[in-house]
């Protein structure tokens, strides 16, 4: 460390500043505070200046540490964008949450929630509140939410969150907080939780949270002391009875809470009572699985025995000694299965088997075969076999029609028994010889004899045809029952025949009607003849005659209608009579021909009468023509009156008109 010594002279001394001069006549301003006391102008001062290196190092290190802290605080921890999450979604609301804000060295200005790109709300106290509930949404509608964080370091956006409100049948968003329950109403927590699990709702809560949708209770005795109930009221959470949960389960959709408030009418609650919950019901599904396994295990031995019975006859053909050993084994195994030992009881056992459709074919075959007594000779064995064969046949004949169903099931066993029967006749002789040789063996060989009788079954051939015969006999009455049905349809066909025959005379009755029109045409001829002399008279008369013929035509029509009515009445009476009578179809054809002949005769007589009537009508028409001429004269007189009136106006033409009128009068008088 180096130092410098300098001598200075005080030139001027002020209160704050002193002027010092060097030996080189340089002036230095120096604060008077640093000068020693009792210094005056002209005093010489010695000043020593030196460098402190140690202090320089300390100061440098201290500065670096401060600079590192500043970089760590403001350079490494930057503000992070918010992370938005979905807590719960219901039909009309949703609950959103976000992680705590990380601003670094920046300061928060605001936190804003945007819905579908539109500013929705400003979140108050964003450092304390990290969740918000948005209500008033539409059912089954998609929504998009996003947070905007504004800080002193800039603006940060969260990722967009897309959600969809639930349908009315989706109850996965229901969150129930359980309150106090009345023990007298016999509704437990297990019943409510079981209903919630059935509808797929969220687990039952014990404390009210922001995602709580319903508060369930039915006891309000301690309303003031229950903090959860007060909090539910403060958060506008609906307070409902437990039956509301049951109603949602029954209806399979979310139900309105209006009828389930604590002060609402309780008549609705009767329809939504909770079923009793037992532990057995909860473990019922678990108990079903081992039961099914045990049932499968019980079926396995039955299937194996059927396979052994089918395979045993083929083995006996090759090795009869092995058949005896297998017969001993099967005899010991099947002995406890067959409860009948006497052949007399075999028929009753078969009758009981017919009523049961689910009996295994292996068990049926064991029951149908009697277990013989040990040490039987050939003749005794044959006689006992025949007796046993006859008794089951009687039982089959007396059995109910339900054997048809059992017979179908035993078709598989019959096919095996037929193969066994073919081999059985060959083996019976060998079995008989073996029985004679084994008489001295004692009781140990008894199962072998029984098994040999089982393997050689002549019974199967006799049982099967009788069962088929009974089936055929049962089908025969069904065919006979259809015959009277066909006979009952025959009279129906015969009953339609008289109806067809009754229509025939009606068609024939129309013929005389056509014939009756002919005289009517003839009646019009004299009218034409009467008009001929009128045409010879003169021109003005022709006009009047044409008018009269037109007037006379309705009269002729009326007379013609009367003439037509008479033969029609006759034909109608003829046509109606045969339809009312009950006559055989053969006789009806002849009667119809007679009626047609009678009608033709009456029509011929009618023609003669019509000719007479036409003559009378001609005379009547001539008189009518004279009457019409008189009417024409009256009309002419009216014309004269009109002509006189016109004569007053036209005097020149009056004379000519009078002459014409006189001529017309003369002609009229001549007529």
Curated annotation (Swiss-Prot):
Q: How does it sit in the membrane?
A: Peripheral membrane protein
InterPro entries assigned to the protein according to its UniProt record, in alphabetical order: BRCT_dom (IPR001357), BRCT_dom_sf (IPR036420), Chs5_N (IPR031673), CHS_Export/Cell_Fusion_Reg (IPR052827), Fn3_2 (IPR031669), FN3_dom (IPR003961), FN3_sf (IPR036116), Ig-like_fold (IPR013783)
List each coiled-coil range: none
| CDD domains reported for this sequence | BRCT_CHS5_like, Chs5_N, FN3
Q: Where in the cell is it found?
A: Golgi apparatus, trans-Golgi network membrane
Q: Which GO terms describe its biological process?
A: ascospore wall assembly; cellular bud site selection; chitin catabolic process; conjugation with cellular fusion; Golgi to plasma membrane transport; protein transport; regulation of DNA-templated transcription
Phosphoserine modification sites are 338, 362, 365, 383-384, 573, 579, 590
Q: Which residues cross the membrane?
A: none
Q: Where is this cross-link: Glycyl lysine isopeptide (Lys-Gly) (interchain with G-Cter in ubiquitin)?
A: 584
| Basic and acidic residues composition-biased segments | 322-332, 409-419, 487-521, 581-591
Q: Which residues form the BRCT domain?
A: 166-262
Q: Which GO terms describe its molecular function?
A: protein dimerization activity; small GTPase binding
Q: Residue spans with biased composition (Acidic residues)?
A: 461-486, 522-538, 627-638
Q: Where is this region: Disordered?
A: 280-671
Q: What does this protein do?
A: Component of the CHS5/6 complex which mediates export of specific cargo proteins, including chitin synthase CHS3. Also involved in targeting FUS1 to sites of polarized growth.
More about this protein = Present with 172 molecules/cell in log phase SD medium.
Describe its assembly.
Component of the CHS5/6 complex composed of the 4 CHAPS proteins BCH1, BCH2, BUD7, and CHS6 as well as at least CHS5 and GTP-bound ARF1. The complex interacts with the cargo protein CHS3.
Q: Would you tell me the protein name for this molecule?
A: Chitin biosynthesis protein CHS5
Its gene name is CHS5
């Amino acid at each position: 460390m180096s130092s410098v010594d300098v001598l200075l002279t005080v030139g001027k001394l002020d209160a704050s500043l002193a002027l010092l001069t060097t030996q080189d006549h340089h002036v230095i301003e120096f604060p008077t505070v640093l000068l020693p006391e009792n210094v005056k102008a002209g005093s010489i001062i010695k000043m020593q200046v030196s460098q402190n290196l140690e202090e320089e190092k300390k100061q440098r290190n201290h500065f670096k540490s401060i600079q590192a802290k500043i970089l760590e605080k403001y350079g490494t921890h930057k503000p992070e964008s918010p992370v938005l999450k979905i807590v719960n979604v219901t039909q009309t609301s949703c609950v959103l949450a976000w992680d705590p804000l990380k601003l670094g060295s920046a300061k928060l200005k605001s936190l804003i929630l945007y819905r579908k790109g539109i500013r929705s709300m400003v979140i108050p106290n964003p450092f304390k509140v990290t969740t918000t509930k948005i209500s008033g949404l539409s059912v089954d509608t998609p929504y998009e939410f996003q947070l905007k964080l504004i800080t002193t370091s800039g603006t940060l956006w969260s990722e967009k969150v897309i959600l969809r409100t639930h349908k009315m049948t989706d109850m996965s968003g229901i969150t129930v907080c359980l309150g106090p329950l009345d023990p007298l109403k016999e509704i437990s927590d297990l019943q409510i939780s079981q209903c919630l699990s059935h509808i797929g709702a969220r687990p039952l809560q014990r404390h009210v949270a922001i995602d709580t949708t319903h508060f369930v209770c039915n006891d309000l005795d301690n309303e003031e002391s229950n903090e959860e109930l007060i909090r539910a009221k403060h958060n506008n959470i609906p307070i409902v009875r437990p039956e509301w949960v049951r109603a949602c389960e029954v209806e399979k959709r979310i139900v309105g809470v209006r009828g389930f408030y604590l002060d609402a009418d309780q008549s609705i609650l009767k329809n939504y009572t909770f079923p009793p919950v037992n532990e057995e019901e909860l473990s019922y599904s678990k108990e079903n699985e081992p039961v099914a396994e045990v049932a499968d295990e019980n079926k396995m031995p039955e299937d194996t025995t059927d396979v052994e019975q089918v395979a045993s006859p083929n083995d006996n053909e090759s090795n009869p000694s092995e058949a005896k050993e297998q017969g001993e084994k099967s005899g010991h195994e099947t002995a406890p299965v067959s409860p009948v030992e006497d052949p007399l009881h075999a028929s009753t056992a078969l009758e009981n088997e017919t009523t049961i459709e689910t009996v295994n074919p292996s068990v049926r075959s064991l029951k149908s075969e009697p277990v013989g007594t040990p040490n039987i000779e050939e003749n005794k064995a044959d006689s006992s076999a025949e007796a046993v064969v006859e008794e089951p046949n009687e039982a089959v004949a007396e059995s109910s029609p339900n054997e048809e169903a059992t017979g179908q099931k035993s078709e598989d066993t019959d096919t095996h028994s037929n193969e066994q029967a073919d081999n059985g006749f060959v083996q019976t002789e060998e079995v008989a010889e073996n029985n004679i040789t084994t008489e001295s063996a004692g009781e140990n060989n008894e199962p072998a004899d029984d098994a040999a009788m089982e393997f050689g079954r002549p019974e199967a051939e006799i049982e099967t045809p009788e069962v088929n015969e009974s089936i055929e006999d049962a089908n025969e009455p069904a065919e006979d029952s259809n015959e009277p049905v066909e006979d009952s349809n025959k009279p129906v066909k015969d009953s339609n025949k008289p109806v067809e025959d009754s229509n025939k005379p009606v068609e024939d009755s129309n013929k005389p009607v056509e014939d009756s029109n002919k005289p009517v045409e003839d009646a019009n001829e004299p009218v034409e003849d009467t008009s001929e002399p009128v045409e010879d008279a003169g021109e003005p008369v022709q006009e009047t005659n044409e008018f009269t013929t037109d007037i006379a035509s309705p009269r002729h029509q009326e007379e013609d209608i009367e003439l037509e009515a008479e033969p029609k009445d006759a034909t109608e009476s003829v046509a109606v009579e045969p339809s009312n009578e009950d006559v055989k179809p053969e006789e009806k054809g002849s009667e119809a021909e007679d009626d047609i002949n009678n009608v033709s005769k009456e029509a011929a007589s009618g023609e003669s009468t019509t000719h007479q009537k036409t003559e009378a009508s001609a005379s009547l028409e001539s008189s009518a023509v004279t009457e019409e001429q008189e009417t024409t004269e009256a009309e002419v007189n009216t014309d004269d009156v009109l002509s006189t009136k016109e004569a007053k106006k036209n005097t020149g033409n009056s004379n000519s008109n009078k002459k014409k009128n006189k001529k017309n009068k003369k002609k009229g008088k001549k007529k």
